[in-house]
Amino acid sequence: MWLGVVTLFPEMFRAVTDFGVTGRAVSKGLLELQTWNPRDFTHDKHKTVDDRPYGGGPGMLMMVQPLRDAIHAAKAAAGKEAKVIYLSPQGRKLTQQGVEELAKSSSLVLVCGRYEGVDERIIQTEVDEEWSIGDYVLSGGELPAMTLIDSVSRLVPGVLGKQASAEQDSFSDGLLDCPHYTRPESLDGLDVPAVLLSGNHEHIRRWRLQQSLGRTLLRRPELLENLALTGEQEKLLAEFVDSIKQDD
């Protein structure tokens, strides 16, 4: 997958290219990331990249000309098939379903805003989609862009050591993940559930599915409203609810 990022702070993306899962993906050639800094497209000695908004008010906007030229350069490098995404609080909220949609693209251009944002006409003429990582305010689009890159890259074939790791992640099937345990078997009086030590793969599968369903019910019940549960899932969830009532 090819990713282009338009940002005033390209150095921040070393966290993506040099570390962890995404860093390994870059070193293997599975992920390519390039950055374009609007400052490199300015025409004044001060490399000005902000401008005052019409109508007044606090704050500044990103200057149109350097930003637009940087986007054009990124699009030219990406090719005609690239989708241009602006990271914005007004955008569609990023979910695992959205991540899966974006992962089908061979190339993406991510535009990171700063200051109070960008000229609306840039969004209208240069941007294909707006995406948000949540209902809160950040200082710029770089962290949301890195979040999107990390989540999308996990679905690129070969990036994870085992594809099952991605398939078992929270939200991959619309549910929260089940609890996980490693050594030691007992920690401060808390023991690993016996079923995980049994070696019975079918029992372990059912336990994990039940825990995933139960955790979703307790922590994010709204997620279940949009799911069509199978007969097995309904039975396991009912058993989970009964066990809670008995504990009470």
Swiss-Prot record:
S-adenosyl-L-methionine binds at G113, I133, G134, D135, Y136, V137, L138. It catalyses: guanosine(37) in tRNA + S-adenosyl-L-methionine = N(1)-methylguanosine(37) in tRNA + S-adenosyl-L-homocysteine + H(+). CDD domains: TrmD-like. GO terms for biological process: tRNA N1-guanine methylation. GO terms for molecular function: tRNA (guanine(37)-N1)-methyltransferase activity. Its EC number is 2.1.1.228. Pfam families: tRNA_m1G_MT. It is found in: Cytoplasm. Keywords: Cytoplasm, Methyltransferase, S-adenosyl-L-methionine, Transferase, tRNA processing. SUPFAM superfamilies: alpha/beta knot (SSF75217). GO terms for cellular component: cytosol. It comes from the Bacteria. InterPro entries: Alpha/beta_knot_MTases, tRNA_m1G_MeTrfase_C_sf, tRNA_m1G_MeTrfase_TrmD, tRNA_m1G_MTases_N, tRNA_MeTrfase_TRMD/TRM10. Homodimer. Belongs to the RNA methyltransferase TrmD family. HAMAP family: TrmD. Specifically methylates guanosine-37 in various tRNAs. This is tRNA (guanine-N(1)-)-methyltransferase. It comes from Shewanella pealeana (strain ATCC 700345 / ANG-SQ1). The gene is trmD.
